[in-house]
Each structure stands twice: as structure tokens, then as C-alpha cells.
């Protein structure tokens, strides 16, 4: 096993670009959007626009730090540098926790999607199989991960664009009845209780699911340590975020809700598949099921990659067991991949014990972890700016826009989301679990890391360049 050699820079601009595209298209869109639609109705489009604006500010804050100092471990390392070791410890492990929880949601969605074709097969069997498959692939060279993400992302993007064009074609050419008795068109956005049928309360409630949908997009910052030219490719990837949000979330859900009455969109599978199946277009439903399965596989792949690299960075800083920093001959932190695979077996157990309730529970907990990570990223960027002179700020190659008002508004929005989780009964458990997790991390740091602080822990350095 390699220990002296660092992570390999095996991710090209093409890999990073499509990872940026693919990270916006996952379980939160293909499955979780059904719950968000039921909460807010067509007004969910506003929730995605507002949440997307806040997420873009998070990504720009992360991009400023990642371009300034591209390292393995990314924002966990930045938090240690600018907010202190405890903050880095809490942020790094909360991100790893987020990836575990999100991955459990993703493997659960994979099992649900497979039920479209094989309803008689127990879901936990599919979950177990995909955990072993993706875990094995992540033990390969990082280029294998990059290539897999490239092709899966290409498939997802192509399918979304094709679905949007097909939906617009159905509306434009008067394909208003497909044997279902339902009208097709923009009238569906207003005919079933209005554009905001559940009021402002429904719109606010949907933020818990909407923010979960954006979770994982920060993986672009984690890839900085393995990107061949981070100062060029990361800004391009991050600046494409607003367009991706408009295309993949707002326009996509707009078309879906125009095609089919939103009150009849259920949660027994992907709403994308349901709508085309109910419209009588069975072949399109089958193709879309392949796409959503691919999206779930891609998301699981990214989850394992992101958590593994964060734990590797934590180990370099002395915030995780030293074994997590061991590399295979392919330059992969193999121990962290094994740990992630073992953690995902919890998902297998949950799908065996409570198959009907597992997704909502996991998604709400993931929302807490996701928003906590974003809040810490924003606070870290503010702390970095405060530590810099005017000359240093002027030399930043990718500065955050609308400083300081943009980051301040994004910070306030993240705090607001915590309030949403605590206010609505369905998500209160997530806030409780999240608070317990943070308290556990604080206690763990004080008992484990702080006594060793004077022993001189290794510091994360930029990954070595291997072309």
C-alpha cells in the first residue's frame, strides 16, 4: 500500500465538468421531487429557484477557497485553517455523515426503482447488491470513477433534455388526451387549487425536501485535490450551477406538472416514470426507469467517493484513524471505501426492517447534515476573507460575488432551513438527530483529538500531480 505518495490527479476537465452536471441530477430530483410537489404544489418551482440561489452562493464560496488552495479534504481542511481544529473536525465528519445518509437514501431509491420491473423481489436484495458493486468500483483507479461518472452523467443529461423536448412537443402539438382524460398544458399549474394550493406554509415546508435534492453538489470542492487543473476547471464547473438548476429542476418540473395533474403524482416510484406510464407511453416510462436507475448508481458512486476523500483528508490532519490515509497501488484511500461500504449495510438493514418509511426518515436527516455543511462552508469563507489583507483579496482568482451581502443572505437562509426542520412535525426527528450528532462530535473532539493537539499532527497538502 502506498503511504508516502499522495492522491493522484487523475480527474480531467471532462470528468470534473460532467461530475458538476451529474451532481445536480440525482435521487432528490428523480424521486424526492414527488414529496416536494405534494407539499407546495406548482409553487415548488419557486422553492427550487430560491434554494438554488442559496446553493450557488455556497458553491462560489467553496470555489473561492478551492481555487485559492486546492487540497485533498477540501473544506474540512479550510475549516481547520480558518475556524480552528474543532470546526474542521466537525465539518469533515458531518460531511462524511451526510454522504453516508445520502447514500442510504440513494441505495433505497435504487431498490424502489428496480421494483418497477421486479415487484416480487425484496428491496433489500437490490440494495445489498448495489452496495457491493459500487464499493468494488471505488477501489479502482480514480480514472475509473471519473469515466463512470462521465458516462452516467452524459446519460442523465441527455435523458433530461430529451424528456423536456418531448414534453414541450406534447404540449405544443395538442397531444392533450392520451386515453387518460387529463388535459395537458399550463392549465395544470393553476386548475388544482391554484399555483400555491397549500399557501406559503406549503412552500416553506417543501424546502426540507428541496434542499436535500441539492445535497452532494459540493463534491466539486472535494475533487480539487485530484483535478489536473483546478484553477481552470473548478470555476467553469461552478459557474454552470445556475443554468443547471434552471434546466434540471425548474424547467424539468415545470414540464412534468404541465403534462400531468400534480395532485396525482405519488411516491411509489419516480414521478418521471409514473407520469409517462400514466400517459400511456410505456416505452418512455421503461427508458426513464433505466435513466433514474443510472442516476441512483451515479449518486451512490459520488457519495462513496466524496466521503472517502474527506475521511482521507481528516486522517492527514490527525482527525481520523491513521489507517484512513493509506493508499492502494492505484492511489485510492481503500480503507475509507471499505468503511463507507460497511456503513451502507445499515441501509440494507433499514430496507429490510422498515421499507415503507425509510426514505422520508433518511432524507430529512440528510437535509440537516447537508445544510450544516453548507453553513460551515459559508462561515469558513467569511473567516478566510477576514484573515486576508486587501492585497491578498485582490489577488483571489475566483472571488465570491456580491461580497459581503451574498454570503450573509445565504447564511441567514441556512439558519432558516434549520427552523423549518424544527417547526414541521415530519422533520423534527431530523433536527433532533442532527443536534445529537453535533454534540457527539464536540465530545469526541474534546476526548480524542484535543489531548493529542500538542503532539504535532500532519497537515493536509495538495495532492501530487500525476499526468
Swiss-Prot record:
Catalytic activity entry: L-histidine(out) + n H(+)(out) = L-histidine(in) + n H(+)(in)
Xref: Pfam families: AA_permease
Description of activity control: Transport activity is inhibited by the proton ionophores carbonyl cyanide m-chlorophenyl hydrazine (CCCP) and 2,4-dinitrophenol (DNP), but not by valinomycin, nigericin and nonactin. Uptake is reduced in the presence of the sulfhydryl reagent N-ethylmaleimide (NEM). Uptake is not affected by arginine, lysine, proline or compounds structurally related to histidine such as imidazole, 3-amino-1,2,4-triazole and urocanate. Only 1,2,4-triazolyl-3-alanine reduces the rate of L-histidine uptake significantly.
Gene Ontology biological process: amino acid transport
Phenotype upon gene inactivation: Deletion of the gene severely impairs growth on histidine.
PROSITE patterns cross-referenced by the UniProt entry: AMINO_ACID_PERMEASE_1
Matching Gene3D superfamilies: Amino acid/polyamine transporter I (1.20.1740.10)
Entry keywords, A to Z: Amino-acid transport, Cell inner membrane, Cell membrane, Membrane, Symport, Transmembrane, Transmembrane helix, Transport
Effect of residue 218 to D: Retains 70% of wild-type activity
GO cellular component, one term: plasma membrane
Organism domain of life: Bacteria
Gene Ontology MF term list: symporter activity
Effect of residue 27 to A/S: Retains 60% of wild-type activity
Transmembrane segments: 18-38, 39-59, 71-91, 99-119, 125-145, 155-175, 200-220, 245-265, 280-300, 334-354, 358-378, 402-422, 429-449
Topological relation to the membrane, as annotated: Multi-pass membrane protein
Intracellular or extracellular location(s): Cell inner membrane
Main location: membrane
Keyword Transferase attributed: no
Family listed: Belongs to the amino acid-polyamine-organocation (APC) superfamily. Amino acid transporter (AAT) (TC 2.A.3.1) family.
Role played: Major high-affinity histidine transporter. Binds and catalyzes the uptake of histidine into the cell. Functions as an histidine:proton symporter with high specificity for histidine.
Protein name: L-histidine transporter HutT
Organism: Pseudomonas putida (strain ATCC 47054 / DSM 6125 / CFBP 8728 / NCIMB 11950 / KT2440)
Gene, per the UniProt record: hutT
Amino acid at each position: 500500500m502506498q503511504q508516502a505518495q499522495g492522491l493522484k490527479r487523475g480527474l480531467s476537465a471532462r470528468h470534473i465538468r460532467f461530475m458538476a452536471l451529474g451532481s445536480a441530477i440525482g435521487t432528490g430530483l428523480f424521486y424526492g421531487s414527488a414529496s416536494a410537489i405534494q407539499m407546495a404544489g406548482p409553487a415548488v418551482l419557486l422553492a427550487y429557484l430560491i434554494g438554488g440561489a442559496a446553493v450557488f452562493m455556497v458553491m462560489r464560496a467553496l470555489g473561492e477557497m478551492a481555487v485559492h488552495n486546492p487540497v485533498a479534504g477540501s473544506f474540512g481542511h479550510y475549516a481547520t485553517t480558518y475556524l480552528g481544529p474543532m470546526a474542521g473536525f466537525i465539518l469533515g465528519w458531518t460531511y462524511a455523515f451526510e454522504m453516508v445518509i445520502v447514500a442510504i437514501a440513494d441505495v433505497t431509491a435504487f431498490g424502489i426503482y428496480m421494483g418497477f420491473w421486479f415487484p416480487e423481489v425484496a428491496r433489500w436484495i437490490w440494495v445489498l447488491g448495489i452496495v457491493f458493486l459500487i464499493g468494488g468500483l471505488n477501489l479502482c483507479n480514480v480514472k475509473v470513477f471519473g469515466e463512470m461518472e462521465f458516462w452516467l452523467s452524459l446519460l442523465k443529461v441527455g435523458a433530461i433534455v430529451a424528456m423536456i423536448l418531448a414534453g414541450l412537443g406534447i404540449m405544443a402539438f395538442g397531444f392533450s388526451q392520451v386515453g387518460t382524460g387529463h388535459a395537458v398544458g399550463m392549465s395544470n399549474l393553476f386548475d388544482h387549487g391554484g399555483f400555491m394550493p397549500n399557501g406559503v406554509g406549503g412552500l416553506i415546508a417543501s424546502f426540507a425536501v428541496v434542499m436535500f435534492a441539492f445535497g452532494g453538489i459540493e463534491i466539486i470542492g472535494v475533487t480539487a485535490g485530484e483535478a489536473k487543473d483546478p484553477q481552470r476547471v473548478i470555476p467553469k464547473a461552478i459557474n454552470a450551477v445556475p443554468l443547471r438548476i434552471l434546466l434540471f429542476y425548474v424547467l424539468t418540473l415545470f414540464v412534468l406538472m404541465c403534462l400531468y395533474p400534480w395532485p396525482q403524482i405519488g411516491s411509489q416510484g419516480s414521478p418521471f416514470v409514473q407520469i409517462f406510464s400514466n400517459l400511456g407511453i410505456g416505452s418512455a416510462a421503461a427508458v426513464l426507469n433505466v435513466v433514474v436507475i443510472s442516476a441512483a448508481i451515479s449518486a451512490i458512486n459520488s457519495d462513496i467517493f466524496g466521503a472517502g476523500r474527506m475521511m482521507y483528508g481528516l486522517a492527514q490532519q490527525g482527525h481520523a484513524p491513521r489507517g484512513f490515509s493509506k493508499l492502494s497501488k492505484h492511489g485510492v484511500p481503500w480503507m475509507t471505501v471499505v468503511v463507507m461500504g460497511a456503513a451502507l449495510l445499515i441501509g440494507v438493514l433499514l430496507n429490510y426492517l422498515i421499507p415503507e418509511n425509510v426514505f422520508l426518515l433518511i432524507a430529512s436527516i440528510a437535509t440537516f447534515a447537508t445544510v450544516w455543511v453548507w453553513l460551515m462552508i459559508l462561515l469558513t469563507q467569511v473567516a478566510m476573507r477576514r484573515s486576508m489583507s486587501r492585497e491578498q483579496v485582490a489577488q483571489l482568482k475566483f472571488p465570491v460575488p456580491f461580497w459581503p451581502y451574498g454570503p450573509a443572505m445565504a447564511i441567514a437562509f441556512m439558519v432558516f432551513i434549520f427552523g423549518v426542520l424544527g417547526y414541521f412535525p415530519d422533520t423534527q426527528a431530523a433536527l433532533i438527530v442532527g443536534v445529537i450528532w453535533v454534540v457527539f462530535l464536540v465530545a469526541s473532539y474534546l476526548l480524542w483529538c484535543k489531548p493529542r493537539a500538542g503532539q504535532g499532527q500532519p497537515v493536509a497538502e495538495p495532492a501530487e500531480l500525476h499526468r
